[in-house]
């Protein structure tokens, strides 16, 4: 298991982000018409990004193509192909961008707009950039990978993970914590 924590300078962060992610200008999103299950919207999508639903036993049930404006629902699996990129914006203003060959599951998202209280927990494989919204100002967002848990409060983090390693770059914010998962055998 390999865990790597990076703290980037402002200039190297700008260079890294500009190389990896598409700059989104003028993306307007309306959150007023969300049902109880809808927690966000796809703000930008490049090539094939899918929303996959698995039942409680893990059996695949449904796959939908994600396009700009697509409503994000909790517990769905958002996946990109080898050329895919997508940016999602949650109703508290949290934005996350996933790179090629990546997968994110929004396990838990609770948000009270009156108090800005709530929490966010997700699973991620591949490349993810998270910009915390109102929920992460008070409570850390949790990003679970196969080998570590990354907590980020009030900031921006880039996480790159696969089955053997997780790298987390703390770009900006209040705090980031990376906790390696222990082997169950010892």
At which residue positions do the language-model features occur?
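Flexible, surface-exposed loop/linker segments and immediately adjacent secondary-structure boundaries
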Residues: 33-186
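Bacterial N-terminal signal peptides that target proteins for export
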Residues: 3-21
């Amino acid at each position: 298991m390999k865990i790597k924590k990076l703290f980037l300078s402002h200039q190297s962060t700008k260079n890294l982000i500009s190389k990896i992610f598409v700059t989104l200008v003028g993306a307007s999103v309306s959150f007023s018409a969300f049902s109880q299950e809808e927690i966000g919207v796809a703000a930008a999508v490049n090539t094939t990004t899918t929303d996959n639903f698995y039942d409680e036993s893990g059996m695949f049930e449904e796959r939908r193509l994600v396009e700009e404006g697509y409503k994000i629902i909790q517990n769905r699996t958002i996946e990109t192909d080898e050329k895919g990129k997508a940016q999602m914006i949650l109703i508290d203003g949290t934005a996350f961008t996933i790179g090629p060959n990546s997968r994110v599951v929004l396990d838990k998202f609770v948000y009270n707009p009156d108090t800005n209280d709530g929490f966010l927990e997700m699973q991620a494989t591949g490349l993810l950039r998270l910009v915390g919204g109102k929920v992460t100002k008070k409570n850390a967002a949790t990003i679970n990978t196969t080998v570590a848990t990354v907590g980020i409060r009030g900031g921006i983090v880039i996480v790159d993970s696969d089955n053997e390693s997780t790298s987390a770059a703390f770009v900006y914010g209040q705090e980031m914590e990376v906790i390696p998962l222990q082997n169950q055998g010892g």
